[in-house]
Amino acid sequence: MQDKLFCQNERYILILEGVILNKQELCNKYKGTWEEAVIKMYEQSGVTFMKELRGSFSGAVYDKRKELWLLYVDPISTKPLYYYMDENGDFACGTQINYVTDTMKANGIRREADEHGLSCVLVYGNFMDECTGVKKVKRLFPGDYLVIRGENLEKRTYYQLSPQKRKGLSEEEYIEALDAAFRNAVKRMIEKDQEYGYKTIIDISGGVDSRMIAYTAKALGCKNAISITYSQSGGREIKIAQEVANHLGYDFYFKSLDNGSCIYPVDDNVFMNNGSAIYTGITGGKDFLQLLNPADYGIELTGLLGDVYDGSMVVRDGEEEPYLEYGQYRFGSVLSYDDQTYSEVLGRFENLELFWYYIRGMICGMSSFPLRQNFVEPLTPFGDVEFMEVYMSTPWELRVKEKLLCRWMVMKYPEAARIPYAATGITPAEEFTFLGRSKKMIKFINQEIHRQLHIMHRGYLMNPFEYWCKQRPEILEFMQKYYMENKERADGRIQSKLELLMKDDTPVQDKALALTVLSYYKQFLD
């Protein structure tokens, strides 16, 4: 793709990996080729020139005169960078963690397990800060960059969201601002595929985030697109996704996950997502995407970072100081918090919502992006800088308590609001009626009764792991075999934690956490 750069002249070495949605705008502004535009941006703005870029990217600049390396990622880190530097000044970096760990191994540098990082994965399902599972190997945090001169490395931030609130706006004005920013983000993504002649992939589920994207794309005239979903068959997710696709007229493709096969590719998933989160997180996404012809498809539009229905990832204490014991955002249910389950970035966020928006939304939720990038270019319009700024400038109370984002859908996309939301069984339009709230309460009570009676119903969940394993005992046999073959790779407290997670009566997802960490040892530490 012509968005990428790998070139040099007498002054600079330029490396840019990614999809730049405003490339043509920048070429016009700086009156030159893409390479010339990037050089002018750097010469005018210095080490924070990447502030002008929009899209999915990471990159590096070497300034030959200043003998300075600059490394950077985009504001939400869709294309991560990993790096190592020791007290001797030895440095390595790469867009995949194995590039760094393989370089360490080739140079005789010992690769030691980071107990803090791996403990966080075993509890939360993901890393909680810039750490990895390897000591001295870090991941560049979203919106950060590195400046390296000789043996000196300095980490700085060029972009971070803040909870600055717009005041004095009416509900309708907030909605207009959200909609304008969102439509512009989707428009840029569609136009990028049009630039290269690719079809756009639109993920559709039973939720409302993906639905917002699909209806916006249709309103913008996007025709060269397909819609996809993957889930347990017979459930609400597939029925609602199909209804959305049929209503919009997009070709619709569905992959059933009934056989639970997404639990088997432990090593492949951990390798491709850099071991950054639980390996089952993508469920059937990889199996689906690898069926597609990569010559035909460009951007995959996902609803990650959305939370249109709830209005926030944090539905209580959103404006309080950040804390870690937010039970909603931990995959594990067996292990307790301990002295290793902490976060070194807790203090950089002003409130609880922002902390979890970055950790759960970007570090965990978007951990599947590097895996997807083997097949397509995943993007989320909810991660567009201008949209995020409007979103975060809208008061938390208004977004959550008054469900402003649901009202946005009802006002701007009324047809989408008349289709039920899989999680509640009611439509977003009914959310503001007594009848709708009553229906939601009845559904909640029914599900709670089933839970208390230990009745597993495949229709309630998009990815019913416990149901799959009950129906197919060979899945648990596989997980146990993988554990037995690899358990000696771990040691100390990590090994003890793995033993607890692999007991017969532990949930499947806890076992998946154990396998994730063992695969991490196998591929990045041994």
Positions of the model-derived regions?
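Active-site lining segments that contact anionic ligands and/or coordinate catalytic metals
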Residues: G143, Y297, A512
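C-terminal non-catalytic accessory extensions
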Residues: G492-D526
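Short, motif-level signal for alpha-helix interfacial/capping segments enriched in acidic residues
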Residues: G55-S56, G361-C364, M462, E466
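ATP-dependent adenylate-handling active sites, centered on carboxylate activation for C-N bond formation
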Residues: R65-L70, M85-E87, G150, T157-I419, ...
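Alpha-helix initiation and N-capping motif
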Residues: K23, W34-E36, G46, I97, ...
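Cysteine-centered catalytic environments shared across enzyme families
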Residues: M1-I204, V208-G260
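PAPS-dependent sulfotransferase catalytic core
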Residues: E415-D504
